[in-house]
């Protein structure tokens, strides 16, 4: 994570703890094309609602890195702006409570509704501050309960008690940036941006494919874990070694698309791992065949 990103996170955290995250929304980066300005403006409003102005400022700081950068056209910048906003507003129990309350506010006088979502214990604990969550996770890991046990949570606006509980759950956003889940998401976003940056330097034609790998990670639960695992497998098995110069892969974009097509909802990732190994072997054999003989 860059020094600027760390400072932005710390500045937001300290302001939030003392109740002073009432800053004005951050300004859009200079030099944004008009269509991207619209996307970024919507993202800022989304992230202010999600977490606060300080958090939206982190988004702006991250987006600014790619404004005017060589090789980044309007379409690519728009995709970065859109997909980064989606990932920075990741779905957790706090967000579900926020959206449920927003649904109630948007439909005054309408009958309430209830949604039931199932979470694993590690997901629920992951929304807590890390200093608390780590002790609980260690105990539950020892018991083998963290992923095996599912908990059904009811998000309801049908009663005053349900609404009150939603407000309490939504109010936990104050601690979100100290949570285990946020730490993982922050690392992921920074690594995704880093891989985009490396692609622009090492293999510019693959940059759009790297940008769009963000769509692999969605939601929560098993779908989220599978997407994250598949993303890491593709980046670690294909993109990073190509950028490092240890894998002679001339068409990284095609390889990423091929690997994504092979990804199945399989925790063992058998098909994906076979495909990545096949692509690596093919690239190595091709480079060997075209190498000049001594």
Per-region residue spans from a language model:
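Active-site loops and adjacent core secondary-structure elements that bind or stabilize anionic groups
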Residues: 1-294
């Amino acid at each position: 994570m860059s020094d600027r990103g760390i400072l932005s996170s710390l500045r937001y955290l300290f302001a939030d703890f003392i109740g002073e995250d009432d800053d004005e929304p951050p300004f859009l980066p200079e030099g944004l094309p008009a269509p991207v300005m619209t996307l970024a403006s919507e993202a800022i409003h989304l992230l202010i609602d999600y977490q606060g102005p300080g958090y939206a400022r982190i988004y702006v700081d991250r987006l600014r890195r790619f404004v005017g950068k060589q090789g980044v056209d309007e379409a690519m910048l728009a995709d970065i702006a859109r997909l980064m906003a989606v990932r920075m507003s990741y779905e957790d129990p706090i967000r579900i409570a926020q959206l449920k309350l927003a649904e109630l506010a948007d439909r005054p006088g309408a009958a309430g509704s209830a949604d039931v979502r199932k979470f694993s214990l590690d997901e629920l604990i992951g929304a807590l501050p890390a200093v608390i969550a780590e002790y609980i996770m260690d105990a539950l890991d020892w018991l083998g309960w963290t992923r095996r046990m599912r908990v059904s949570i009811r998000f309801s606006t049908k009663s005053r008690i349900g609404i009150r509980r939603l407000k309490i759950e939504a109010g936990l956003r104050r601690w979100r940036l100290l949570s285990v889940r946020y730490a993982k998401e922050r690392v992921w976003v920074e690594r995704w941006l880093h891989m985009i940056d490396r692609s622009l330097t090492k293999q510019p034609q693959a940059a759009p494919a790297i940008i769009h790998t963000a769509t692999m990670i969605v939601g929560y639960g098993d779908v989220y874990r599978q997407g994250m695992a598949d993303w890491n497998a593709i980046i670690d098995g294909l993109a990073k070694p190509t950028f490092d110069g240890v894998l002679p892969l001339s068409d990284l974009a095609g390889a990423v698309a091929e690997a994504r097509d092979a990804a199945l909802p399989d925790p063992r990732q058998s098909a994906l791992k076979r495909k990545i190994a096949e692509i690596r072997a093919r690239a190595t054999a091709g480079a060997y065949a075209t190498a000049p003989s001594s």
